[in-house]
């Protein structure tokens, strides 16, 4: 006579339980691996909404510009992604154009915009909006080489 623990129903239940445990472990591992990217995306959500609103209606989010820059910087630090750097470049550009700053602070904002645009383009060089931001910053900073023309050409 067979022991009760080796009946077919018990073996099937044991296999099902082991598959459930394996699936649970796999889910935890995948969540742990995806957590930095997920956290960066959650931090970047308000920035993404503000950038999309700006492109739709043309009104810059001046009241929240510093907070949005901080969120974009934090997202890029958590997970370096082209969209985060491109959004940061746009926010610095808007700060330079619409901010009430002396010329030195305006120049610094354009330099930060150019640096963020360069980081974004290093990750994904096919974004015309970022090329245009780069060209505008280079033009304002009085770059006299062919780089400005090349940046404008890449934005078209």
Language model regions located:
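Hydrophobic membrane-insertion alpha-helices, especially the h-region
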Residues: 18-37
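Extracytoplasmic/periplasmic/luminal assembly and interaction segments
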Residues: 62-112
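TPR/TPR-like (Sel1-like) alpha-helical repeat modules
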Residues: 148-154
């Amino acid at each position: 006579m067979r022991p009760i623990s080796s009946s077919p129903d018990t073996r099937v239940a044991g296999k099902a339980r082991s598959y459930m445990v394996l699936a649970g472990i796999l889910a935890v591992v995948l969540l742990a691996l995806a957590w930095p990217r997920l956290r960066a995306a959650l931090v970047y959500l308000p920035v993404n909404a503000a950038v999309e609103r700006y492109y739709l209606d043309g009104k810059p989010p001046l009241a929240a510009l510093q907070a949005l820059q901080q969120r974009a910087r934090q997202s890029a630090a958590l997970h370096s992604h082209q969209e985060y750097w491109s959004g940061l470049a746009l926010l610095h550009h808007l700060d330079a154009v619409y901010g009430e700053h002396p010329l030195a602070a305006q120049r610094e904002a354009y330099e930060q915009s150019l640096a963020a645009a360069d980081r974004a383009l290093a990750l994904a060089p096919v974004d015309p909006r970022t090329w245009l931001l780069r060209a505008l910053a280079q033009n304002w900073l009085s770059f006299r080489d062919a780089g400005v023309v090349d940046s404008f050409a890449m934005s078209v």
